């Protein structure tokens, strides 16, 4: 089973790419955003920690997480954002590993981890290849403002700047899918990526019946991604 990581930045089209992989090509997607919502359900350890660190004001009256309030608390405070990530990321990683184990047992040939903060959360180290969805910064802002008309141009800029620079993500990624044009062009770019990420049936079968092969594959992926990060740091 090949594990791939899919990431991007806000309004670059990552969700569209993820949906196309899943709906047209029937590739299993594990969505980190879905898992992130799961780990902060009422009475979960994560939500209890968040309440302790950020106060009762980040909860609704029914005990569910008030995402708007929490977002306001961490959006422009890097320290609080880092604290929140330190609470949520480990729990999401654990849920993701559980999902990956289920996928392996069920014989999936390929699984894509849809993770907005793939590199920030260091999730690339379990991926054989990483994919970043990219677009020009001006197009990114236009899409963000069109999607969220309540935002000002300054708000859009702040949201873009709050994330790891997209150019850095592209440098860290193994594959970049450009999304600077229309949907038809994007779908063509996705189609062109498939030969680079699709394992053979024979390889999938071998990984399933020979667990040591899957373990070896993961070790190779870890070493490869580590090497890529090390090389990247030498040039910054």
UniProtKB/Swiss-Prot annotation:
InterPro entries linked to this entry: Depp_CoAkinase, P-loop_NTPase
Listed GO MF terms: ATP binding; dephospho-CoA kinase activity
UniProt entry tagged with the keyword Isomerase: no
GO-annotated biological processes: coenzyme A biosynthetic process
Subcellular location as annotated: Cytoplasm
Cellular compartments per GO CC: cytoplasm; mitochondrion
This protein's UniProt keywords: ATP-binding, Cytoplasm, Nucleotide-binding, Phosphoprotein
Modified residues annotated as Phosphoserine in this record: 82, 86
TM segment ranges: none
Residues covered by the DPCK domain: 3-208
Residues where ATP binds: 8-15
Similarity comment: Belongs to the CoaE family.
Protein name: Uncharacterized protein C14G10.01
Organism of provenance: Schizosaccharomyces pombe (strain 972 / ATCC 24843) (Fission yeast)
């Amino acid at each position: 089973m090949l594990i791939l990581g899919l990431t991007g930045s806000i309004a670059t089209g990552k969700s569209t790419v993820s949906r196309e992989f899943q709906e047209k090509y029937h590739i299993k997607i594990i969505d980190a955003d879905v898992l992130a919502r799961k780990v902060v359900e009422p009475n979960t350890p994560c939500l209890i920690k968040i309440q302790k660190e950020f106060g009762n004001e980040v909860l609704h009256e029914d005990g569910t997480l008030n995402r708007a309030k929490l977002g306001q608390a961490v959006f422009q405070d890097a320290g609080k954002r880092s604290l929140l990530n330190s609470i949520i990321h480990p729990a999401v990683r654990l849920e993701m590993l559980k999902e990956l184990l289920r996928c392996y047992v069920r014989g999936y040939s390929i699984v894509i981890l849809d993770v907005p903060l793939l590199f920030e959360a260091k999730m690339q180290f379990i991926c054989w290849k990483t994919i970043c969805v990219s677009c020009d910064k001006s197009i990114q802002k236009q899409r963000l403002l069109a999607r969220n008309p309540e935002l000002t141009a300054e708000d859009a800029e702040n949201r873009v700047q709050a994330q790891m620079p997209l150019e850095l993500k592209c440098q860290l990624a193994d594959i970049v899918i450009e999304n600077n044009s229309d949907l038809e062009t994007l779908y063509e770019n996705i189609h062109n990526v498939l030969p680079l990420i699709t394992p053979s049936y024979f390889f999938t079968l071998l990984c399933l019946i020979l667990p040591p092969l899957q373990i070896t594959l993961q070790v190779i992926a870890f070493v490869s991604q580590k090497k890529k990060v090390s090389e990247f740091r030498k040039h910054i």
